[in-house]
Amino acid sequence: MAIIMAESSYERRVKALYEKQIRMEALEGKFIKKVYKFNSNLLDVKEAVLRHQRKVGKLQKVVMERREELEKRVSFMEELAQELEATKLRNLAMKDQIKQRKMLARQRKNEIMERIHTLSKTTGTYVNHEALPARVKGVTVLRGDKRDQLIPFDLNATDAEGLDSLCQHLESLNVDVSQWQQLVSLAMDVAMEARAPITPPKEAANCKSIIEIDLTSPTSHQA
């Protein structure tokens, strides 16, 4: 009887150990599944992190490129503003210079015209300014007690022989030829200046106009 009870107790222990082993194997299986799932999820997370890092890297590269482009544009605009200001100052200086030259030219012309008027009265000579500078045309009036003598002249400006002959004739009539020649010379200068094309100062050739400044951004040709 004692032997039977001992065997029954042994079987229960063996059965309990077997059931415990079954439970442990089941728990181990569940644990392995959880570990596998965790590792799988961890791998997915790592891949997602890598994808995110790649995106962040690309975004950082774009941000860096945009920042460099913005810095270049800011630098370009600063240079452009400086160039515009320098051009504005050059243009103002040139306008003042041209204004000053025009004023001096008017003053000189007035002085010449006054001198011409004086010489015209002194020599009694009236020059046809419309004929100049191609021709020397006019009339010299010799005042007389009874009547005045008119000496008209109409010569090609390049006719040196004719002009010399005219001067000799006037000199024979007691006309101050040096003043007469000075009168014709001044009238010729006025006529040539009036017909000469207006040329800007030499500085104007080196002065860049505002509209000629390259307004293309240095970053506009980036790939």
UniProtKB/Swiss-Prot annotation:
Q: What Gene Ontology cellular component terms go with this record?
A: Ndc80 complex; nucleus
Oligomeric state and partners? Component of the Ndc80 complex, which is composed of Ndc80, Nuf2 and Spc25.
Domain of life, per UniProt, equals Eukaryota
User: Does the entry feature the keyword Coiled coil, yes or no?
Assistant: yes
Q: Where in the cell is it found?
A: Nucleus; Chromosome, Centromere, Kinetochore
Q: How is this protein named in the record?
A: Kinetochore protein Spc25
Q: Which UniProt keywords apply?
A: Cell cycle, Cell division, Centromere, Chromosome, Coiled coil, Kinetochore, Meiosis, Mitosis, Nucleus
Family membership = Belongs to the SPC25 family.
What are the transmembrane regions?
A: none
The alphabetized list of GO BP terms reads: cell division; meiotic metaphase chromosome alignment; meiotic spindle organization; mitotic metaphase chromosome alignment
Its main subcellular localisation, reduced to a broad class, is nucleus
Q: Which residues form a coiled coil?
A: 51-116
Stated role: Acts as a component of the essential kinetochore-associated Ndc80 complex, which is required for chromosome segregation and spindle checkpoint activity during meiosis and mitosis. Required for kinetochore integrity and the organization of stable microtubule binding sites in the outer plate of the kinetochore. Participates in SAC signaling that responds specifically to disruptions in spindle microtubule dynamics. The NDC80 complex synergistically enhances the affinity of the SKA1 complex for microtubules and may allow the NDC80 complex to track depolymerizing microtubules.
